Curated annotation (Swiss-Prot):
It comes from Ectopseudomonas mendocina (strain ymp). Gene3D superfamilies: Translational regulator CsrA (2.60.40.4380). This is Translational regulator CsrA. The keyword Endoplasmic reticulum does not apply. It comes from the Bacteria. Its main location: cytoplasm. The lineage of its organism: Bacteria, Pseudomonadati, Pseudomonadota, Gammaproteobacteria, Pseudomonadales. A key translational regulator that binds mRNA to regulate translation initiation and/or mRNA stability. Mediates global changes in gene expression, shifting from rapid growth to stress survival by linking envelope stress, the stringent response and the catabolite repression systems. Usually binds in the 5'-UTR; binding at or near the Shine-Dalgarno sequence prevents ribosome-binding, repressing translation, binding elsewhere in the 5'-UTR can activate translation and/or stabilize the mRNA. Its function is antagonized by small RNA(s). Keywords: Activator, Cytoplasm, Repressor, RNA-binding, Translation regulation. HAMAP family: CsrA. The keyword Transcription regulation does not apply. One of its GO terms (molecular function) is mRNA 5'-UTR binding. GO terms for cellular component: cytosol. One of its GO terms (biological process) is positive regulation of translational initiation.
Length: 61
């Protein structure tokens, strides 16, 4: 795992097309903004896991 330190307003790049910007820090919460092409899905981990679980629950055709 790569660990980076960023301040509010600073950005990191993921590949050529995705940026992650630190928008704010309040207590133990960090607000981030993600810019990515439409074809790149961006989800919180718990939402992604729920989507994957629901895909697994669907009957096969």
């Amino acid at each position: 795992m790569l660990i980076l330190t960023r301040r509010v307003g600073e950005t990191l790049m993921v590949g050529d097309d995705v940026t992650v910007t630190v928008l704010g820090v309040k207590g133990n919460q960090v607000r981030i903004g993600v810019n990515a092409p439409k074809e790149v899905a961006v989800h919180r981990e718990e939402i992604y896991q729920r989507i994957q679980k629901e895909k697994g629950d669907e009957p096969s055709h």
